């Protein structure tokens, strides 16, 4: 039995030197594992006289139990220390001032789009969208701009291939809508458009909203009244609006809509180049050829169309003088909205 006591004492001496869980497990395996030293002592029982067997078995079991209890106690201390360390590292001082979350806001272009859509929805217009990679057919041909037409020079176009472009306007949505829907039609088509131009007032990508109304007995007076009401609503002012004759291949007659300068109330300033007027959108009565391309009978139905640059309206509403600021992701700029 002396050898069992010596083995037990040796195990406890080694146990006292252990400082981590891995070393602790090594001792458990060394003495209590299937091939452990104390476990191996049980095999000697078969070689002993019958009267000695119970004594050795009892001594080994007592030693194994004492060592297992000591190992469990030490393991519990290690786990408690680990838990305390983790709790300390994750400790929260509830007396400290909280860290607030920064509140985001909508981009000014998004706000402008929302204002535009809200007005026209209130006036019975639906919102329609279309592909940004558009066919030459929908971007030009159906809008009375054939391949030989000089008006194509007005557009600095990004060509994907010989028959597809990055759309230069959202007018193609109007044709697609007329093809699938008979009058009365009231839609606006907001979206990104692309032109090869970049300066203080132009970017290669910008946003447009185009509108279309097709019905019986539609007149230019209806168009003027709608757009005047829109500008008054958008700028929250009772504005003077004038319509100047212009040219667009897809409308006849065509006009440019100017409004009283919102910066100087029409008195003349740098923004309006001291004229008192600001050009804000183009419009006109839908050309019969465009109605025909959309499978609309131009003898029985008339329509008007209009288009506006969203960034242009944003700049005027918020007093921004450089279009490129909308796309620079500068928080100093965006936080103002």
Swiss-Prot record:
Record InterPro entries: aa-tRNA-synth_II, aa-tRNA-synth_II/BPL/LPL, Phe-tRNA-synth_IIc_asu, Phe-tRNA_ligase_II_N, Phe_tRNA_ligase_alpha1_bac, Phenylalanyl-tRNA_Synthase, tRNA-bd_arm
GO molecular function: ATP binding; magnesium ion binding; phenylalanine-tRNA ligase activity; tRNA binding
Places the protein is found: Cytoplasm
Top-rank taxon, per record: Bacteria
Residue pairs linked by disulfide bridges in the UniProt entry: none
Primary location class: cytoplasm
The family this protein is said to belong to: Belongs to the class-II aminoacyl-tRNA synthetase family. Phe-tRNA synthetase alpha subunit type 1 subfamily.
Subunit structure: Tetramer of two alpha and two beta subunits.
Classification via NCBIfam families: pheS
Name the record gives this protein: Phenylalanine--tRNA ligase alpha subunit
Organism: Francisella philomiragia subsp. philomiragia (strain ATCC 25017 / CCUG 19701 / FSC 153 / O#319-036)
Gene of this entry: pheS
């Amino acid at each position: 039995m002396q050898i069992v006591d010596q083995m037990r004492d040796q195990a406890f001496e080694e146990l006292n030197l252990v400082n981590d869980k891995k070393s602790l497990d090594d001792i458990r395996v060394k003495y209590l594992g299937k091939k452990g030293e104390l476990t191996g002592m049980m095999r000697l029982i078969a070689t002993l006289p019958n009267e000695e067997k119970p004594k050795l078995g009892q001594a080994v079991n007592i030693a194994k139990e004492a060592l297992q209890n000591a190992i469990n106690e030490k393991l519990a201390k290690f786990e408690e220390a680990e838990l305390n360390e983790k709790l300390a590292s994750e400790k929260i001082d509830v007396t400290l001032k909280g860290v607030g979350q920064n509140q985001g806001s909508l981009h000014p272009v998004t706000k402008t789009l929302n204002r535009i859509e809200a007005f026209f929805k209130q006036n019975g217009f639906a919102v329609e969208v279309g592909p940004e990679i558009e066919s030459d057919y929908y971007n030009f041909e159906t809008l009375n701009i054939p391949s030989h037409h000089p008006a194509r020079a007005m557009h600095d176009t990004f060509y994907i291939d010989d028959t597809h472009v990055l759309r230069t306007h959202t007018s193609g949505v109007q044709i697609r809508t007329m093809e699938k829907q008979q009058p009365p039609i009231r839609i606006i088509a907001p979206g990104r458009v692309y032109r090869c131009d970049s300066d203080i007032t132009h970017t290669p990508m910008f946003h447009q909203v185009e509108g279309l109304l097709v019905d019986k007995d539609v007149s230019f007076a209806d168009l003027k009244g709608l757009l005047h009401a829109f500008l008054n609503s958008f700028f929250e002012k009772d504005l003077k609006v004038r319509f100047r004759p212009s040219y667009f291949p897809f409308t006849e007659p065509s006009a440019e809509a100017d409004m009283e300068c919102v910066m100087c109330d029409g008195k003349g300033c740098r923004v309006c180049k001291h004229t008192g007027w600001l050009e804000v959108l183009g419009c006109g009565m839908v050309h019969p050829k465009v109605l025909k391309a959309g499978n609309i009978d131009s003898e029985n139905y008339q329509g008007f169309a209009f288009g506006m640059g969203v960034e242009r309206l944003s700049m005027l509403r918020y007093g921004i003088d450089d279009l490129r600021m909308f796309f620079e992701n500068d928080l100093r700029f965006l936080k103002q909205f």
